[in-house]
Amino acid sequence: MSATLELARELIQRPSVTPEDAGCQTLVAERLAAAGFGAEWLNAAGVTNLWAQRGTERPLFCFLGHTDVVPSGPESAWQHPPFQPIVENGCLYGRGAADMKGSVAAFVAAVERFVARHPDHAGAIAVLLTSDEEGPAVDGTRRVVETLAARGAAIDYCLVGEPSSQARLGDEYKVGRRGSLTGHLTVHGEQGHVAYPHQADNPIHAFAPALQELVATEWDQGDADFPPTSFQISNIQAGTGADNVIPGAMEVVFNLRYAPAVSAEELQERIESILHRHGVHHTLHWRHSGAPFATREGALIDAVEQAVTAHTGQCPRRSTSGGTSDGRFMGPTGAQVVELGPLNATIHKANEHVAVADLEALEAIYFDILQHLLAPAD
C-alpha cells in the first residue's frame, strides 16, 4: 500500500465532522515532524488549526487543506460505513475521500518524498490545515492568515487541495474565485386588513419595483477569466399565513457573486441607491464572505501546468467557476494561489469516493510542482 493511500485511509477513519478534527491534524503533524517540520497550533473557538513549516527562507510554498468533513447523512444510503475506508473496484470510499482528505494525504506524502530527496531544498515549505472549512470558516484559515500577517510572514505560493477536477484528474484547476457578498434585507411596512389597504403599507408592493431593477441590473461585464457579477434572491418571507392580512414586514436574503472588476463596497452603494430611489423603507445588514482573487500568471501557474501535463498528457483548463474556498483568505495576501485536486463528482454525497490511481497521480503532480519551484539548483 502506498504512503498516500495509507494516510488517506487513516484520515478517513477519523470522523471529523466540522468543526471536529478527531486527531487528523495530530497524525499529520507527527508525520511532518519526522520530515523536519516544526508544528504550531493556532486553535481558536473550538477549531483546530495546524501550521507546520520547514525552512525560513523565501520563497515560501504552502499547501492549504482542511480536515473537517460534512455530515455523512443516513448511513443506509452508503454502500459501506462512511468512516470505514474501503477500497473497491479501484476506488477509495469514505466521507472526505475527495473533499479533501485524499488531497491532504497526497500532499503530505509528496512533501515527505520531496524533503527526503532534497533535504537542502530552496525556500521553505508549509502545510496549513483547519477543521473549519465546511462550517462558518471564521476561526480557521481566516484566523491563521490574520495571525501570520500580523507577524509579517509572507507566503509566495499557495496550493489548495480542493477537488477541482471535473471528468478526469487534472482536466481543470482554479486560478481564482469570485467574491461572495450576502445581504439580509428587512422591508418595513404596516400590517393591516387586505380590505383596507389605505390603512396599511404593504412591504411586498413597496419592494417590487426595486426588485425588478435589482434583477435587471448589469453590475459589470466580467473579464477574460471571470463571468459577470450575478445577483440572486435566495429567500423571501412575509405574511402571517392568513389570506386577509397585509404583512407588516418582509425579509429578503440575496447574494452577489462578484468578479474583481467591481468591489464589495461599490455593490453595496449601488444597491442602497436603488432601494432609496424607490423609496423602500428598509434595514440592510451585509455579510462579506470573501473577496475575489485571481492568479493570472506566474511561477506557480507554470509549475502546475507543466506537472499536470507531464502526468496526464493534457494541459489543464484554467477556471474561476464554482463557490468559495479557503483560497479567498490567501488571495488578498499577495500570494499566488491555485486550487488543484481530485474529481468533485461525489463530494458531499453518499458513497463519496476517489480513484486510487488518481490519488497516486495527484501525489506525483504535487511532488513535481515542488520540484519546479523549490528543488535546489544543480
Curated annotation (Swiss-Prot):
It is an enzyme of class 3 (hydrolase). Pathway: Amino-acid biosynthesis; L-lysine biosynthesis via DAP pathway; LL-2,6-diaminopimelate from (S)-tetrahydrodipicolinate (succinylase route): step 3/3. It catalyses: N-succinyl-(2S,6S)-2,6-diaminopimelate + H2O = (2S,6S)-2,6-diaminopimelate + succinate. InterPro entries: ArgE/DapE_CS (IPR001261), Bact_exopeptidase_dim_dom (IPR036264), DapE_proteobac (IPR005941), Peptidase_M20 (IPR002933), Peptidase_M20_dimer (IPR011650), Peptidase_M20A (IPR050072). Zn(2+) 1 binds at residues 66, 99, 162. Its cofactor is Zn(2+); Co(2+). The active site is at 68, 133 (proton acceptor). Keywords: Amino-acid biosynthesis, Cobalt, Diaminopimelate biosynthesis, Hydrolase, Lysine biosynthesis, Metal-binding, Zinc. Homodimer. Belongs to the peptidase M20A family. DapE subfamily. This is Succinyl-diaminopimelate desuccinylase.
